[in-house]
Amino acid sequence: ANEWSQNANMSVRWWNQRIADYGGGFIFLLYLADHLGGGPAVRQLVQSTAQGAAAIENVARSPVGASPGVIGTDFRDIYANFTIAATLDSDQGIYGLSNLYMTPACGSSDFCRIQPAATNSDWTTPYSSTGNSVEGWGVRVFKFTPGSASSAPLTMRFTGDVPGMDGVIMSRAISDGTYTRS
């Protein structure tokens, strides 16, 4: 699983027999089981006549042991919520996994969260990160902290090389630690 957590730019949907493919698939199925009703939800997924994203969407819309749509109703939202959970492993509902403890840093014997491609806390000059390739349905995580800079609005721009690339921004409230997705 850590091979994918350290290389989450690799797709969860494309299967190329890489160790990371097994790790990403394992964590994704644990996430679906955790939030959609456990073993019965996985059974529902495996028995579905639909394939790929459509099968996952069907289970999410009519789960055996959870509220419909709890993690989203289309694959884009389901995948975004999964990658947030695999990055944060928060105890804030869908942004974590209760059936797997994930450590912030990768070690030899622990499962780890998605590792950031880059971090930044120096805002004395503009920050830029280039050359971050991502396979379809892969993810790149960047961690930004305020550092010693005074509070100011943060402007972000994402430029993808391919149409249809999407991004999600998660922010954490200083007052209570609650995460917000935008």
Predicted regions and their residues:
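Acidic/His/Gly-enriched intrinsically disordered linker/tail segments
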Residues: A1-H35, V46-A86
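Loop/turn elements at helix/coil->beta-strand transitions in domains of secreted/extracellular proteins
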Residues: L36-A41
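Beta/coil-rich, acidic/histidine-enriched accessory regions frequently appended to metallopeptidases
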Residues: Q51-S182
